[in-house]
Amino acid sequence: MKFGKSLSNQIEQTLPEWQDKFLSYKELKKRLKLIGSKTADRPVKRLRLDEFSVGISKEEINFIQLLEDELEKFNNFFVEKEEEYIIRLKEFRDRIAKAKDSMEKMIKIRKEIVDFHGEMVLLENYSALNYTGLVKILKKYDKRTGDLMRLPFIQKVLQQPFYTTDLLFKLVKESEAMLDQIFPANETESEIIQAELSEHKFMESLHMKSTIAALRVLKEIRSGSSTVSVFSLPPLQLNGLDETWKKIPLLEQEAK
C-alpha cells in the first residue's frame, strides 16, 4: 500500500482530536507539483539546509515553509501530550492508592490504564508515521529539483522533540508497571488478555480500535524495506509490541 493511502487510513481511524495533527502530506504533494522540474537544467548538488533560501523559486519557498510549519505542529502536539501523560500517570497512582479496597473501582481503573497505554502507543506511531512522511516527501523534492535537501533536513528532524521518544518509553513502562500492580498475581498474561477481549465495552473502545489501526500501519512501515540507511526508523522501543502485532488479526476480529 502506498504511503499516502496508509496515512489517510490512519488519520481516518485515529482519535478525532488527533486528525489534524498529522503530516499534511497531500498539501505538500500539491505544492511540490507547482515546482518546475530542474533536474535536466542543473547538476545534482548537496547543499546545507541554510542555503535553500538562496536562488530558489517562490514555489520552493512555499514548500519549505510548510515543512517548517509541520515540524512546529508535530513538536507542539507531541510535547503537549507528553506533559499530559505525566499528569495522568500521577492521577492514576493516586486513584489506585485510594481504591485498593474496592474491586469495582480497580477494574474501572484497569480499563482506563489499558486505554491510556494504547494512546501512548498511538503517540509512538504518530512520531514514526510523520517521520516517514517527511523522508518520502523530501525524496520526491530532491528528485524533482535536483537538490539534495533530504539529508540535511532529516538530520535536523532527528533533533526534534517529536522524534525523541525516550520520555514516552519511560511513561509506557510506568503504565505497564501499574497494570502489573493491579492484575492479580496468580492471573497469567493469556488469561488477562482473554478477559479483556471478552469485555464488550472494552472492545468498543475508540482507543482500542485506533491503537490496532496504528499498530498495523507501524508494522507496514517498518516491514516495507529491509535496507537500513540514515533515513531508517530507529528500533522500536516499546516492549511487547511484537507480540501485539501477532495478535492484530484476532484483535481486529474481536473489535468489530
Swiss-Prot record:
Stretches assigned to the SPX domain: 1-155
Recorded superkingdom: Eukaryota
Principal localisation: nucleus
Entry's Gene Ontology cellular component terms: nucleus
Induction field: Up-regulated under phosphate starvation.
Role, per record: Plays a positive role in plant adaptation to phosphate starvation. Inhibits PHR1 DNA-binding activity in a Pi-dependent manner.
Record's protein name: SPX domain-containing protein 1
Organism this protein belongs to: Arabidopsis thaliana
Gene assigned in the entry: SPX1
